[in-house]
Amino acid sequence: MPNDIRVLLLGGTGRTGGRVLARLLERGVEVRAIVRSARRLEPGTANDTRLTAVEADPLSLPRDELLELVRGCDAVVSCLGHNTDLGGIFGPPRDLVARMTRRACGAVAVLRPAEPVKFVLMSSVSVNRPDRLDTRRGAIERAAVALLRGLVPPAKDNQDAADFLCSEIGQADRFVRWVAVRPDTLVEGDGSGYALHEGLVSSLARPDKTSMANVARFMCELVTDPRAWDEWAGRMPVIVDAAVSV
Ligand SMILES: NC(=O)c1ccc[n+]([C@@H]2O[C@H](COP(=O)([O-])OP(=O)(O)OC[C@H]3O[C@@H](n4cnc5c(N)ncnc54)[C@H](OP(=O)(O)O)[C@@H]3O)[C@@H](O)[C@H]2O)c1
């Protein structure tokens, strides 16, 4: 079990982020979590001695404080997402995920770590890979997704965050390496097994299911298993539930 890995977790009070937090702690990882309210942490994790929870709005956390939280971390994991009420979907901050991705990567760049820091982003199958690499998505579906982005701010936010990683961090950054994990429709369930794909496998009209437990498990693998990291770094894997464990 890794006992010398340190992670900054964003969105650790969320449905998937809470599961990521539990899995990381189970694996002996030291976690720093920026949360708006520590009361929203699962009771089983809130008192874990390996967890440091900082109560703050991550977007307005002063830069120096963010730097101190990022300093010494091997990875930053973001499970941020807009709350699903009207205010969360259409109100500010419309750029929650993208802006926090920029902030966290910017903090890493300021710190100039000797080894690149891993940035693991929870993304979505609604997010396209650049250069039309998702060949499964034809013109009609691309138009539907573009419309979705125009109408629903979180969809644009998720695309902007991934675009930032692909285009501005890219593949050769000295300080940040990244993976954007793309689940399909999130469901409950024990996450007994999952399949990973380079690109999209289902259409938006006939979506697959991805249990949050599986997303959490894979995000933790990326942080703790160098082979998983080497396989997926700089890529945007699609994760869906599978009958057979991987
Ligand atoms: N729903 C799906 O089927 C689906 C499929 C694929 C991908 N995704 C993506 O997966 C990601 C995570 O989904 P989820 O359902 O696990 O998320 P979730 O349960 O809604 O959790 C969202 C997290 O973001 C935080 N957050 C929300 N608004 C914030 C704000 N203004 N400032 C700071 N923190 C804020 C929440 O904090 P609080 O606890 O304080 O509210 C919570 O920790 C999202 O980006 C979503 O788009 C969703």
Enumerate the predicted regions with their spans.
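Structural motif
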Residues: R6, D74-A75, K118
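SDR active-site strand-loop-helix element
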Residues: L10, I34, C79-L80, F119-V125, ...
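Mid/C-terminal beta-alpha module of Rossmann-like enzyme folds, strongest
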Residues: G14-R15, S203-V246
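NAD(P)H-binding glycine-rich loop region in Rossmannoid oxidoreductase-like domains
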Residues: A33, R39-R103, V110
